[in-house]
């Protein structure tokens, strides 16, 4: 009957999805073993001067045939199989080496390097300890590094998290809240933790020219951050019209395909 058929199809779909996730996990493990997980860098620009201000580090998987995949496509697999730490370590190690190379480049202007971390990884503390150790080894000033905390992650023990981040801030590291405005956690984090930067969710930014609602949201999120003394970064800037709107609102920094695609070296 129809119900049995639907149930069979549903189970079949779940089995297929589970097998696909398992295949992705093996692909990712192999990529890590073969050192084919690499950082790409997307430039973040100063809205006032138009000059590069920072680089966001993005994980990419290089397939054996040379095809490049975004690690974002594997996010469910990474979380399910606990591969976040290995991925973060691989990316941080290479990104910090690239930062050291950039610092050694004659005439290179000052810059900041943004690194994405999940709240779970930060709470595990091993990753931040590793980053701190690498900074010391490579003689990278801690204020070059900005750790981005993803808004969608829930933090279990906020008191411990606050103390831990406070200790790192005292050492000079900086923090950004990613995807601001996309959920309840945004405002909870803003109340409980101290951030140097807020990245306004690109889902709002990309529609500000056409949508009065999104334009109003971005303007008011920007104003909120200004009153709190937090610098703003707009994601998903896909046209000059969007950039003009953001400048008019007083957004500090911007990134997106209109300004620059992610590339394998800091431009």
Each model region followed by its residue ranges:
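Catalytic core of bacterial c-di-GMP phosphodiesterases, primarily the EAL and HD-GYP domains
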Residues: 49-53, 83-160, 236
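Conserved long alpha-helical elements within nucleotide-processing catalytic cores of c-di-GMP signaling
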Residues: 72-76, 85, 166
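Structural preference for long, well-ordered alpha-helical segments in enzyme cores
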Residues: 77-78, 91-99, 130-131, 164, ...
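Short, small-residue-biased leader/transition segments that mark boundaries at the very start
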Residues: 2-4
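C-di-GMP signaling machinery
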Residues: 6-38, 77-84, 121, 128, ...
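Nucleotide second-messenger and two-component phosphorelay signaling modules
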Residues: 30, 34, 46, 64-65, ...
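EAL-family c-di-GMP phosphodiesterase catalytic domain
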Residues: 9, 13-16, 47-51, 61-64, ...
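A short, well-structured catalytic beta-strand-centered motif of the EAL phosphodiesterase domain
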Residues: 40-76, 95
């Amino acid at each position: 009957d129809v119900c049995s058929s639907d149930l069979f199809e549903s189970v079949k779909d779940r089995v297929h999805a589970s097998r696909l996730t398992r295949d992705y996990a093996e692909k990712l493990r192999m990529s890590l073993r073969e050192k084919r997980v690499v950082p790409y860098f997307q430039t973040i620009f100063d809205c006032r001067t138009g000059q590069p201000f920072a680089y966001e580090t993005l994980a990419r998987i290089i397939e054996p045939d040379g095809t490049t995949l975004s690690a974002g496509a594997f996010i469910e697999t990474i979380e399910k199989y606990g591969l976040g730490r290995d991925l973060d370590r691989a990316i941080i190690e290479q990104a910090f080496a690239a930062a050291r190379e950039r610092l050694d480049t004659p005439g290179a202007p000052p810059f900041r390097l943004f690194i994405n971390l999940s709240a779970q990884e930060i709470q595990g503390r091993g990753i931040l300890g590793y980053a701190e150790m690498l900074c010391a080894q490579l003689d990278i000033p801690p204020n070059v590094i900005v750790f981005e905390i993803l808004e969608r992650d829930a933090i279990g023990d906020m008191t411990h998290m606050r103390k831990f981040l406070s200790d790192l801030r005292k050492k000079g590291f900086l923090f950004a809240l990613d995807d601001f405005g996309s959920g309840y956690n945004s405002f909870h984090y803003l109340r409980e933790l101290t951030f140097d930067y807020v990245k306004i969710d690109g889902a709002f930014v990309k529609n500000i020219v056409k949508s009065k609602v999104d334009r109003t949201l971005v303007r008011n999120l920007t104003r909120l951050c200004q009153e709190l003394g937090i610098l703003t970064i707009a994601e998903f800037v896909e046209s000059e019209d969007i950039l003009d709107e953001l400048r008019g609102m007083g957004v500090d920094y911007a990134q997106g395909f209109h300004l620059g695609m992610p590339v394998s070296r800091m431009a």
